[in-house]
Each structure stands twice: as C-alpha cells, then as structure tokens.
Amino acid sequence: MGVPALFRWLSRKYPKIISPVVEEEDHEIGGAKYENPNPNGEIDNLYLDMNGIVHPCSHPEHKKPPETEDEMFLDIFKYTDRVLMMARPRKVLMIAVDGVAPRAKMNQQRARRFRAAKDAELKAKQLEIEVQERELRGEIINDAIKGKKQWDSNAITPGTPFMDRLAEALRYWVAYKLSSDPGWANLQVIISDATVPGEGEHKLMSFIRSQRSDPQYDPNTKHCIYGLDADLIFLGLATHEPHFRVLREDVFASQDKKFTIKDQIADANSNGDTVAKEDKKPFLWLHVNVLREYLQVELFTPRMSFPFELERAIDDWVFLCFFAGNDFLPHLPSLDVRDNGIDTLVQCWKRSLPILKDYVTCDGKLNLKSVEVLMSNLAYKESEIFKNKHAAEQRREENNKRRKLAQEQERALKRVYSSQVSKGKDKAPLTADVNMPLMDTSGQNVEGYANLTNSDIVQNRAILTKANLANSDAAAELKKLIDSKKTQVTVVQDQIATDSSANSETTTSESELEEIQSDNSLKRKLEPEEDKQTQSDDIKLWEPGYNKRYYEAKFHCQSDEEIEQTKRDVVRHYVEGIAWVALYYYQGCPSWNWYFPYHYAPFAADFTNLEELFPEGVKFKLGEPFRPFEQLMSVLPAASGHTLPQVFRDLMSNPDSEIIDFYPEEFEIDMNGKKMSWQGIPLLPFIDEKRLLDAVQKKYELLTPDEKSRNTNKEAELFISPANKNFSKFSEKLYKENENEVTFKYAKSGLSGKIFKLGTFNPEGVFNFPLNEGYMPNVNNSDYFQAIYHFPKTKTGKSMILNGHIAPLPALTTADKNDLLYQLDKFNNRRNGGRFNSTLDNSDYINKGPAGKELYKTYSMRRGGYRSYLQYLTNGHHPDHQSQNSQYLSYGQQKPYGGQGSYNQQGYYNQQGRYNQQGNNYNQQGRYSQQSQYNQYRSNTQRFNNNQNYNQSSNNSRSGYLPPRPQR
C-alpha cells in the first residue's frame, strides 16, 4: 500500500525513527564480507518485498533503463545483493513477489495500469515531437531512438512471461549464493514468487504470524523488512514485535535527477557514452521500536474507564491511518496526510476514548459503536476542516502569484540590463544563447555577423534557421504536428520530464516555433491548476450544502431520497471496507472476492446508526483467489495485451467481445481538487466478476502446457545450504526414505514449518544459468537443497508482545517527549544539523539492537523457555547483566501475565488503585519495588513518585493539569 506523503510526514513528526544506513564500501577484493559483523547491528530475519526492487531495476527514473530483460535480472541480482550486505540476516531470508491480489486491491491495480499505458503512449508521442523539433534545428538524431518502443512496466503482473522468468532467475541466484557465499552458510531462504497468491508484503506478514504461533518462537527475534510502500510501517507495528526495522531507499535524496528525454536522445547519439554514471541512492532505517515510544507518549489518554494498553492503542492508531489513505478504499474527503489528517483523527480518538468502554479495535476486529463515536467527533469538525483547507489553499495561491510576479519582474530587469550591456563593444555578452554564432549551410559564419546587434540577431534567427532546412515547409508541418498533439501531452505533465519547459521563459521576439513551445509549456503548468479550481468550484466544500452537492456531482443522485439511499449504501460498503482492511493487516485476507464498488468515500457525518446496518457484525466469506490470467484480464488495458496468451487478446480488442466494455481506450480522470495528474481518480468501469470469468474460462482449453503452468497458483519454496543443521535430515527423509513430508521445529534453526518433495528438483542434477546475457557459473544441485515449504499452522493473532521479550532501551529523551507533546519546532527538524540531526549523537541512539549485541548470546535459541533463562541468570551467569537480574525476576513473578494466547497488558490497577506502567510491579503493600525501572520509562503525562498514586494524577488531569510547558 502506498499512502502518499506518509513516510515524509512520519519522519518529520517523529524524527528519531529515521537513521541513515552505514554501508561498507567494497573497494578491494576481500573488503566488505557478508560474514563480518554488521555495522548497523545484527539482524535475524530479513524480508524482501521484491516489487520494491523489480520496479526501480526494470524502469529506473534516474538512469538509462536496461535494454533487455536479462539486463534487468542482472541489475536485480546486484541490487538485492547490496540490500543483503546492508542487513546481513543470520537466520532467515524471505523473498516475496506480488502474486494474485485480493479483489479489493485489483481496483487500484487496474487504475494504475491503465494510467501507465496511457502515460507510455503520451511519452512516445512527446519523444516523436522532440526528435522532429531537433531535426528541424539541424541536429542529426540516431535512428535507434526513432520509433523506439519502451518496455511495458505492466509486465510486472502475475502470470506474464516476465514474472515466470523472474522467478527462475531468483531461484538460480539463491542457489548460487548458498553454494558459493560463506556468509550464507546458515541462512534459510524462502521464495514466494508470483505464482503464490497474495501481495508480497502480506505474504511476509503471514509468515511472521505463523512463526509467532510456534511455542518455541524467540520473542527477541530481530526483524527487518525491505520495501518502498509506506504501509510496511503499519505492518511492522501490527506484528507487535519489539525488535523491528524497515529498510528503504531515501527516495527524496535525488528526486530531481531524472533521466529525461534529452538524456535519452543524447545517450542514443553517443552510443551510451555521455550519460553520467548514476550515484548510489542512500538507504534509511526506520526503527519501529522508536515509533512505538513516540506513540506511547502521544496516545496516552487519562480519565479512561478502562486501563491504558499500549498495544491496543497502537492498533487503534494504525486503524485511524486507514481513513487517511490505503490501497483498498478512497480516503475520507476531510482527511489528507499532507494536511495533518492523522493528527486530526488522533485528537478525535482521544476525545472519544474516555466515554467508550473499550478500544475501537481488538485483534483486527471493529467495535462498530466505537467507530460511530469516533466518526461523530470527526463530523463535528468536518465543515471547519473544509473551511480551513480552502483558506490555506487561497493563501498558497496568493503566495504563488506574488512569487511568480516577482520572478517575472526579475527576469524582465535582467533582459533589459543584458541588452544594454551586450551593446557595449568591450563587454562580454551575458546571454550566450541570444548571441550565438550564425552559420550558413556550408558551416561558415554568416557574413556581417560580427556587426549584428542583439536585436538584429533575434529578428533574423528564425529566417537563418529555416534557411538551413532543405524543405521550406518543414517548420509549418512541425507546427501542425505540435498543435494536434499538445493537448494530449498536457495530461501527464507532472510525470514526464521535458526540456521544453525552459522555453516558457522566452520573449515574444523569438521565433514562431519557440513561441509554440513556450505556449505548450505554459499550458502544461497552468492546466492542472485550472482543473483543480474547476473541481473545487463544482462542490464548494467550504460552503453550506456541500453534502448534497457532493452526492449530486460524484454519485449522480437526482433527488433527496436517492441521496439518502446512496449515502447509506456507500457507508455500508465503506464500513465493510475498513473492517476488511483491519482484518487483512492483523489476521490475513478475510475475503478474496470483496471490493469497494465506488470511486469516492462518504463524509464522516454519514457514519450513523452503524449497528442497524450490521446487526450481527461485519461478516465475510473467504472465497478463492483468481488465477493469474484472470487477474491479468481484470487489471490490464488492451495496450498491454501482448503480455497475455494470444487466445485472450481478442477479448480486449475486438468490438464484438462480450467484455469489451471493461477495456476503454479513453477514460475520464477526475482531478477531485488535486493538482498533480497522478492524484486524479481514473473513472474506470468496475469489473463484473461473473462476466469476466465466464469469458476467460472458455479459452482455457486452448492454452499451451507452458501457459497452463503459468496460470496455476503454486506454493512457496525453501532453500538451504549443506552447512544448515537440517540439511542431512531433509535430504535423507525426502529423497532417500521417500517420506511425503517433514515437519521441523523452531528451536533447531530459527525456522519452523513443513516441507514436501519438489518434483522438479533432482539432488544429482545441475541448475544451469538461465540468462542469455552476462555470465555466472552453473550450480550443482548437491550444493544446496530445495523443497516446497508450508508455514506452520497459524493461530488467531493477538495484539500483544509475547512473554519473555527484552524491551529495547529507550531512545527518546525528556526533550524529545516534550517536543512531541507540545509540538515544538513541528516539522522543522531540518534545522540545526539537517535531516538526521536527532540521531547523530551516539549516546542518544542505540544502533546495535535493544541493549547491545551481547545481550542476545545467552538468550538466543534458548532451551526450556523463559523460566529456564531466568534460572540461568540467577545461577550467576552473564555478570555484565547482573544489575538487570532483579528486574527479570520481578517480571517473571508478575501474576497478570498469562500464556502466549493472552494479552500482555501494558498497564493495570492494583488493589490499592495505584497505576502500574510498563510492567513495573508493586510489592504486597502496593508500593514500588526497589528493582522497579519506573523512572526509566515514565512519560511526560504521568508524573508519579513513590508517594503519589494514580488517582491523584487522574484528579489533576480532570482539572486540566499538564506538566509545565518547557522553555525553548
């Protein structure tokens, strides 16, 4: 899920969650090695969301794209190896590629792929225009660039030949690394390719939940997930794992360095020698444990009728973020991450919580009454939010107008000054492009050129340029071409980088062609703003009556009665949607067939009487996932039909096809008040599942064996090296004793599950290098092991941290908490040292795990459970941590902690009514024990001491008590 601007917003509001990755440079052979200690701290399990690697490697934005698919695969190998060298997992590596998605996700996939096809078409037309413009100027363009077709990124969809080849390439690369890299000797690699249903990141989460269900699971496992989607942060929180990091590119580090059409033409003309080598993008860590600390401070709410539990509060916070944007539902009209919509919802949540009897969510299930109270609080502020957004937009537009006017005035002054200075005989020209030498057709300087004034040059440039052309009508033909296509180019102005934008600053004295370019560039800049103003004026959300106007404009309602009926239906489906998303994040996909059947969301004020809509709660039927070709037919436009088997293409392009209406060539994009075209809403028809499946399944008998194989949903595979502890057991039982399956537990290697014999794997065979380009050696199958892998049976996930965890050391100081509570220097963390100023002090940030690497040696892969580990400590082992023994013992004696199926409450009342925070226990007299680490964990909202009880603090809170505002 990509929630726009979420990562930037989080990193600004919670600055300490981000730190740069320390990357060792391999300057010489034998330099950086995988088996060496990790300078970023050790990691047990690494999870790769491979689509975050495949996309930038196959169609990069900042460098020349690969010419062939084999080049893409080699780039993927190189990129993945770089990621692994940064993370260096020691136990498990899971590689997950997006498989067939739930129906709810296909709406967004369909919109993205239709837009991608349209953008590719417009970019090809723009390249054609650019080439002809340059030829009219006398440039010689390499024939290789003319009519060149760009690689179709829509091929990165399950079921295409590209994805089949990608899976085979990944299997080879893993086998090669296991057989040749000493650092991979004990690594267990799971590959879940595009034939395994499910989105990549959610397949990773399913794996984590399955491992947590194993009684031998180590609750101090250090997890890391790589990917570009912002929802990985939510997924990390949803695991309730205390040691979790997200690894990602710093996408904002070089966002202005685009590989433009100018670069593309220059590269073709020079055979690839002129384009500068791409600088490596830096990477970032996002520390989920630090985000948990921030949320503990921000979400604490006094005066509640039930105990505050951090894990439940975090689940509610994740749920609140769904309303601001997700891949399955449109966000509420009043909420946007860029406008601090999440902060608005958190305020509503904190106001609602004291009057509720429970949290809004529990293990991914919704309390509809709590949802209704939450929405009523938001509805109370909704009209004010629209007014404030409109006022802010007006101020922004006025500021932009003033800034543009100032820039125009400055440019005018420069032109006047430049013209005056250029007339002087002893002065160098300030504008070299205006005083450029003029050549005749033989390449000689134009006679009398040195005597021409600046004005003469400008007036005669167009005539002299046209004289260089053999065809006197070429300029007129080009003008007609541009006039006919310029309106199409404007649609994707914000996605396609061009060089003609510089011409928008030219003067009216320049040539006719340059005036056309300037006009085009100006329209590309102004039209989205005009669309935005038009869309805003249609509904006028800041004026009374916006609710009725909204349903009339967006849902085409004709009467008040129809509005009410539509409103209830939209709310019903939207509540189903947020219930579906919550379960999807916490328990796995609740239904493969459910989807939201509207393009727009309701208002917060429309969420009324929810229990009447769902008297028995929200229910789902699991259903079955689509087959790969069925998803391709659901999400691809006709322009990408070449990725499908030939038998299906006629269904997408033949006017007589029974489902031709699913594949419009032209479709409306509703900007919906947004500025950038990618933010617009493509108004595509929704797929009728029954009609689609009936049409597609009629063609199955015409498929070739290879195509039938690509259209089959399959299972994950496990790879290990001969050095793995389970290698001998697996090989003997599956291939010598011919057992059907082998079950293995977590304690031996840090992984549990079942394996089955893979029919295509021969232990005595050879894995040949599958690419035609590049060279890598063939791999003997005896140097690695491969089998079908099943996750262990997963129990219902619980919103809790498992017993036996060792909490990370706190990263936030009192000043950090005050900054968050009082919003000091909000979103200005680039001051005083730049982006990472808050994490540069080593004393302020722990970058080697919760308490240093040594803490895990005695605890990792423990036998006998947590009680055995406590006994180990009490016998005098590990003297460096004797000061912590009493804390561990008091933790183990706590009565409220149950088994791993119960909630690990973050706080509860004792019999004397005193509050117990962060698991710090009381003795029998209700007083703090001497071993309590209370002072280490206290927050700014709870100022307790040994003689002050919780009720006194609550009374202070009721009277408006807050700690004194810090002086800055």
From Swiss-Prot:
It comes from the Eukaryota. Residues 498-510, 902-959 have a biased composition (Low complexity). Residues 882-893 have a biased composition (Polar residues). One of its GO terms (cellular component) is nucleus. Gene3D superfamilies: 1.25.40.1050, 3.40.50.12390. Residues 113-140, 387-416 form a coiled coil. It is an enzyme of class 3 (hydrolase). It holds the Pfam family XRN_M. Its EC number is 3.1.13.-. It is found in: Nucleus. Residues 498-538, 873-968 are annotated as: Disordered. Transmembrane segments: none annotated. GO terms for molecular function: 5'-3' RNA exonuclease activity; DNA strand exchange activity; microtubule binding; RNA binding; rRNA binding. Its main location: nucleus. One of its GO terms (biological process) is NAD-cap decapping. Keywords: Coiled coil, Exonuclease, Hydrolase, mRNA processing, Nuclease, Nucleus, rRNA processing, Transcription, Transcription regulation, Transcription termination. Residues 521-538 have a biased composition (Basic and acidic residues). PANTHER family: 5'-3' EXORIBONUCLEASE 2, 5'->3' EXORIBONUCLEASE. Belongs to the 5'-3' exonuclease family. XRN2/RAT1 subfamily. Possesses 5'->3' exoribonuclease activity. Required for the processing of nuclear mRNA and rRNA precursors. May promote the termination of transcription by RNA polymerase II. Essential for vegetative cell growth and chromosome segregation. Interacts with RAI1; the interaction is direct, stabilizes RAT1 protein structure and may stimulate its exoribonuclease activity. The interaction also stimulates RAI1 pyrophosphohydrolase activity, probably by recruiting it to mRNA substrates. This is 5'-3' exoribonuclease 2. The lineage of its organism: Eukaryota, Fungi, Dikarya, Ascomycota, Saccharomycotina.
